[in-house]
Each structure stands twice: as C-alpha cells, then as structure tokens.
Amino acid sequence: LYKNYELILVDDLSEGSVMNLPSALRKKLIKKKIQNIKKLNTKKLNGIFHLAAQASVPLSLIEFCKSTSNNLTSSIKVFEFSKKYSAPVVYASSSAVYGNLPLGSDEIKKFSVLSPYAQDKLTIENYAKMSYKIFKTSSVGLRLFNVYGPGQTATSPYSAVIPIFIYRMLKNLPIIINGGFQTRDFIYIDDVVNVMKKSMNKIQ
C-alpha cells in the first residue's frame, strides 16, 4: 500500500514494535491511541483500515472494563473519522462472535457471545451498520479466524497457539495439547491483507 498511497499510521505500540514496520513507514507513525486523536493532518482520506483492539479473549475477562473501553472507543473514533472524510472502513471483527454455534448456523442472525471481547466485536459491527444507515459511510467487517504470521510474540501468557508451537519446537520443548481432539481454523496474515485490500477496492 505505501508504494501507491500516502499512508497515515496510528498505533500506541502497546503491543508490537515500530521495528515491525518497513523503514519507509516508521516516520509516518503517530504513536497514540486513535481515540485520543482530535484531528488528522490531512484534507482527504481514501479509506481506513481499522485493526486497533485489545484482541485477547482471556485478557478481556481479566481486564473487562479497560479492554471493552479500548475496543469500543477506538472503533467509534474510526467511524467518526469515516463520517468526517466520507471514507470507507475495512475493520477486523472476529470469529469469537460465533462462540459455540453448531456448524450450519445462520451467520447473520445467530451469535453465541461467550466473552467481553466477542461482545465488543459484535457491538462494533452494529456501530458500523448504524453508521451506514445514518451517515451513509460504507464499511466491511471481516470475522477473522486465528490470524498467524511473522512478528507474533510467543512468550506472552496471551500468545496465539501457532507462535507458541513454533517457539517450543525451536527450543526442543514438548508441544502441549490438552485432549487432542480440538479443531481450529487458521489464516495466514498475507491472505488477510489481500482480502482487506480487495474489500476496500470493493467499497471505495
């Protein structure tokens, strides 16, 4: 994207590192929470990719108020900028909204909210619908399943399973699987990026 567009990046770096960015983008980073930014130094936005979130389900149970406040206020701010600039939004929702629904369930009408994080994501989807209904701002929410790829940490108690497995294999440590009958869907980060770009092209 940065080869074809002028980008504005916003991240408080509470997770991740500026070193994960290409060197050409590091000076373009605004190191703040999006909800704390009053205005952007630009006259036009072609589109917004919204990935800001506290994305750990276990942490959302431990720090319920902080987690939910962060997830909702950041998203509301994004839709506010979307309204101001008439900019479409592609945002990350989550497979967590499905909970333990059986296979074949109606994905539009049925949900099984089992955590504050899942409720946050479902609420954000409803804000997106409201924003379109009232302000005519277009958006696409992607209910992502277990994204993995380079740059993930494996040493946090809230780390995803694939980086943990890789870390333990590199250290010649056993891979611990409780039960062994669980099934999960995973998607590689490059595939997510491609879908997000295609989604943005569709609604611009």
Named regions from a protein language model:
Residues 66, 78, 166, 183-184:
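Residue-level signal for alpha-helical context at structural boundaries
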Residues 19, 54, 153, 171-174:
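Charged, solvent-exposed alpha-helical segments that act as regulatory interaction surfaces
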Residues 114, 145-159, 174, 179-190:
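Glycine-rich "substrate-gating" loop/helix at the edge of Rossmann-like oxidoreductase active sites
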Residues 1-147, 190, 196-200:
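N-terminal Rossmann-like NAD(P)+-binding domain of SDR-like oxidoreductases, especially those catalyzing
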Residues 147, 163-175, 186-204:
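Alpha-helical substrate-binding/gating segment
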